[in-house]
Amino acid sequence: MILSNPTNPQSPQFRVLTDPQCAELYHAALECLQRVGIQVHNPAARNLLKRHGATMEDHIVRLPEKLVEQAIHTTPHEYTVWGRDDRYAMQVALDHVHFGPGPTCTYFVDPDTGERRKARRGDAGLTARVCDALPNIDYVMGLSLFDDVTPALSPVYEFAEELENTSKPIVAWANSPESFLDIYQMAIAVAGAESALREKPVFAYFTTYESPLKLANEPLANLMQAAERGIPSVCLGGPTVGLESPFTGASALTLYLASALGALTVVQLHVPGAPMAIGGLPSMMDLRTARPAYGSPEASLHGAAAADLARHLGLPFMGTAGASEAKRVDAQAGVEAALQVMLSALSGASLVHDVGFLDCADIGSLSYLVLADEIIGMTKRVMRGIEVNADTIMLDLIERVGPGGLFLNQARSASLCRKEAWVPSVLDRDPYNIWERKGSQTTEQALTAKLMRILGTHRPAPLAADAQKKISDILRLAEEREVKRQDG
């Protein structure tokens, strides 16, 4: 976790938007919701909004300002997502920055062969185990969309693997109300009781909205289910600039915020005070391919601006970093991750996801996750800033050693070396001859070596036997349900 900006005045200070700019964009989003409206494809959500004064035309709902403002007012400024081990409890609040992977990659880089293949069972477990070992990864998502299970149960199998392979908090997704309830029951099995899970939720629910201005049926149903059960949630999205919004950052931010506030309003009307974060990635359209460019500087800029808007409203925020257009872990991947991680930390985003994404979120890579962990470690050191006081200036020691002297043998100075100096675990600092003597290892080879050490030696804390059995039973019953559905 990184403390950023106002929470740590010693850290570098950074903002994209001024307070007046935030206010103008916020009021534009409110006006958009009132004049243009938002598609709401969940009947219960539409009825809820209508009962509270929204107007409706088919699936398009127009929200009064006061309704949205009340939703912002009732949303908690912070909440906690727990892991199986309380040491990893994650305070989700602005300027408390936590990093983790992303979900639903179609392809996965096989750690044994280094080749891209379809994601399959076991990949989320590998991801969770690596996250469990990496010191700068705070929570777990699966980096995979299983190709070899019943499609409706892909998120359920993923969550089961994650529970087994990490003690850190999990951010889970679901593709139906039934799969959400399967995941919820698994979490109860680990927590021990429904009341214990409500007190210390071991997962948060993640979903997305469609751009522009569209809230789909099942994500809204799951958001409402999560709120009823005290499970924190995140709703993330954002237009591809130039395709799903006009070609300006301001219009993209307006559409992002309007959509996010639409989802927030539904949740807060349903269960006032439900813990929820909004999230945004208004990414630039690549002018040659029309794909969203995750690694573009504009995506990082817009993400940081979206965090400024969340701070202006007092809402927890999910951003994006460690996601590249590169197809392998190469120089491009490193450049794009470094910019994203640094701007995410400076912006104070509460949760930062998609660490380990390659090829526009199509490939999950554990080696890239390891590289991002290194970059996050570097960024943490920058964000700690420079402590300035009489004890750190050490003028008395400077006077004692005098002009031309050295400080290496001064115990008072040397005792601070571990605190002041960041030491890499992958990046190379050896002189050329020593690097050559050690085998002339490239950065990609060093990342692979560290990854294989983790997979070969790290053993997460095991699940209790009764929890394992309950999870197996939930999977079996879910499969039986899906068979009946297909037969029926």
What are these regions (language model features)?
Residues 2-3, 22, 91-113, 312-324:
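N-terminal small/glycine-rich loop or linker at the start of catalytic domains
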Residues 2-4, 15-28, 36, 41-48, ...:
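Catalytic-core signal marking the mid-to-C-terminal active-site face
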Residues 10-14, 289-294, 322-329, 356-368:
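Short beta-alpha connecting loops at secondary-structure transitions
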Residues 39-46, 57-60, 138, 197-199, ...:
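Flexible, glycine/charged-enriched surface loops at secondary-structure junctions
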Residues 44-114:
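Glycine-rich, N-terminal phosphate-binding loop and its surrounding beta-alpha-beta segment
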Residues 119-346, 350:
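Helix-rich catalytic cores of soluble enzyme domains
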Residues 282, 302-325, 350-357, 364-365, ...:
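A glycine- and small/hydrophobic-rich beta-loop-beta segment
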